[in-house]
Amino acid sequence: MTNIRKTHPLMKIVNDAFVDLPTPSNISSWWNFGSLLGLCLITQILTGLFLAMHYTPDTTTAFSSVAHICRDVNYGWVIRYLHANGASMFFICLYAHMGRGLYYGSYAFRETWNIGVILLFTVMATAFMGYVLPWGQMSFWGATVITNLLSAIPYIGTTLVEWIWGGFSVDKATLTRFFAFHFILPFIILALAMVHLIFLHETGSNNPTGIPSNMDKIPFHPYYTTKDILGALLLILTLLMLTLFVPDLLGDPDNYTPANPLSTPTHIKPEWYFLFAYAILRSIPNKLGGVLALLLSILILALIPMLHTSKQRSMMFRPFSQFLFWVLIADLLTLTWIGGQPVEHPYVIVGQFASILYFLLILVLMPVTSLIENKLMKW
């Protein structure tokens, strides 16, 4: 008799995705981040649900409701900090997952990659709106500055910003709608993640060599379920250490001051995971130009499959491309650092140089290097 997991309509779907899935035998720990992102998402949805039970999306009570969660709700402080630091862990996993895709040429699966880019945008939007909810100084001014960028759009800009705000400034209407969107978006992310997986399972996983591995596949369970559990335990350990020992390490002290429209903080900056994009935005002294550069810095990911000029899929056997890849990582870390610094010399010029290098690497240097490597293969 056939096992029920292979015949039952619902269990069959789970079985084909997590049990009997043929998986390359040589995928490394860099392939763990997909499952870790799933774990992060579930954690965020659960902690967020419990926070929403005690939070009030109103300008007069939002800040004190968060204080109430931390002081009066049973283990409310744990839930709140798990949620805040969970977002940081989410982005660490997200960037590692994307870096893996870039390095090993996983972007050759066009549909999977494009859904991934859409997922990135959705997660970024969710994180931004979540940061506004505690209604501290950085929440308010972050929301004001970032939404105001849309006013750079010719002709409809100002109208669009006021439409998003629901008034003439960031106020009660803005907070309420941000809370509504922050609640619904994770479920949209969940649905998109399923589509992401469906497309991935059409082609099967890539592997470090970039060479098709159909003749050498092993079942996902027990090999990769075990490997994923190890990754999950390390993720949980890191998250718990952050939450229980240094809960405010990645946050901004300004957000412990209630929002005040009459007092602007000295340095307005987003959470650490947006700093690289914020640095690119600030490095262009023109509002519309900055907004376009900001958008392009993320949208450029959608162009990656078209910019692939190498005859090899993975960078595993391409030392020059590997070097440029790590230069790109160093450049992004530099941009992240610059984004957190004040707008003054020498940070401005370093930021401008790093921004130019970012686009130059992706659009010119890496494709040209790949062509040179193709020529070298014939020698």
Swiss-Prot record:
One of its GO terms (biological process) is mitochondrial electron transport, ubiquinol to cytochrome c. InterPro entries: Cyt_b/b6_C, Cyt_b/b6_C_sf, Cyt_b/b6_N, Cytb/b6-like_sf, Cytochrome_b, Cytochrome_b_C_euk/bac, Cytochrome_b_N_euk/bac, Di-haem_cyt_TM. Heme b b562 binds at H83, H182. Binds 2 heme b groups non-covalently. It is found in: Mitochondrion inner membrane. Component of the ubiquinol-cytochrome c reductase complex (complex III or cytochrome b-c1 complex) that is part of the mitochondrial respiratory chain. The b-c1 complex mediates electron transfer from ubiquinol to cytochrome c. Contributes to the generation of a proton gradient across the mitochondrial membrane that is then used for ATP synthesis. Heme 1 (or BL or b562) is low-potential and absorbs at about 562 nm, and heme 2 (or BH or b566) is high-potential and absorbs at about 566 nm. This is Cytochrome b. It comes from Balaenoptera edeni (Pigmy Bryde's whale). The lineage of its organism: Eukaryota, Metazoa, Chordata, Craniata, Vertebrata.
